[in-house]
From Swiss-Prot:
It catalyses: L-proline + NADP(+) = (S)-1-pyrroline-5-carboxylate + NADPH + 2 H(+); L-proline + NAD(+) = (S)-1-pyrroline-5-carboxylate + NADH + 2 H(+). Transmembrane segments: none annotated. The gene is proI. NCBIfam families: proC. It is found in: Cytoplasm. This is Pyrroline-5-carboxylate reductase 2. It comes from Bacillus subtilis (strain 168). Belongs to the pyrroline-5-carboxylate reductase family. One of its GO terms (molecular function) is pyrroline-5-carboxylate reductase activity. Disruption phenotype: The proG proH proI triple mutant is auxotrophic for proline. Pathway: Amino-acid biosynthesis; L-proline biosynthesis; L-proline from L-glutamate 5-semialdehyde: step 1/1. Catalyzes the reduction of 1-pyrroline-5-carboxylate (PCA) to L-proline. It holds the Pfam family P5CR_dimer.
Amino acid sequence: MKKIGFVGAGSMAEAMINGILQSGITKPEHIYITNRSNDERLIELKETYSVRPCRDKNEFFTHTDIIILAFKPKDAAESIDSIRPYIKDQLVISVLAGLTIETIQHYFGRKLAVIRVMPNTSAAIRKSATGFSVSTEASKNDIIAAKALLETIGDATLVEERHLDAVTAIAGSGPAYVYRYIEAMEKAAQKVGLDKETAKALILQTMAGATDMLLQSGKQPEKLRKEITSPGGTTEAGLRALQDSRFEEAIIHCIEETAKRSAEIKEQFAGAALERHS
């Protein structure tokens, strides 16, 4: 595996470092990390993972083949300005939400190979559903290397960049909607008489079991739903209540609004990049 440099050392960078090292595709000494000013964080990651903190930009970029942009999106202009002179022919992988490939290339001032990635927070346990898109400058080997790296934190799916707003809505923000559903289930369980701990255990196992049924059976969710819905039974009564409450419409509206907001943020960053370099 090529040597990897993380510019930014937050939670997503740590999740990726953890996944990469657990997978065994590279060694700790082949991972370099840097950030803007937080030395304590770099020391923490060094002590935890035995990776290499590096403040010397020339050394950092001379020794790395893949650069992962993992700082906060709002810091993109300043951060990319500070590293632009050191980027040669490395592959750039961006986990910066809202920044398109074109915007990133605009900040760098040239058409370099860029992989734009949308992971989710389950990367922390190597269960991320990650969508990624590639620039036309990325080679076949670049794509293979990026996919191998991303698969250390979960599943990785190559999509056209125009679909990344949808990926953001479904996968990027998706865990929050699952957690919100579980919150509602916990409240409902307590309302019908269960204590909080019992409710939580039952709900989490039900969610895990239902997901595994979908993955292992190969059946469509509609078929599995119908298999446990008896005419005049308890499940039918509950599903009717969901329908009366416009459950499906609420979910669709949620996803549409998330995708819409993702597109708006994308345009804001693009506009800021053009204004900065006009």
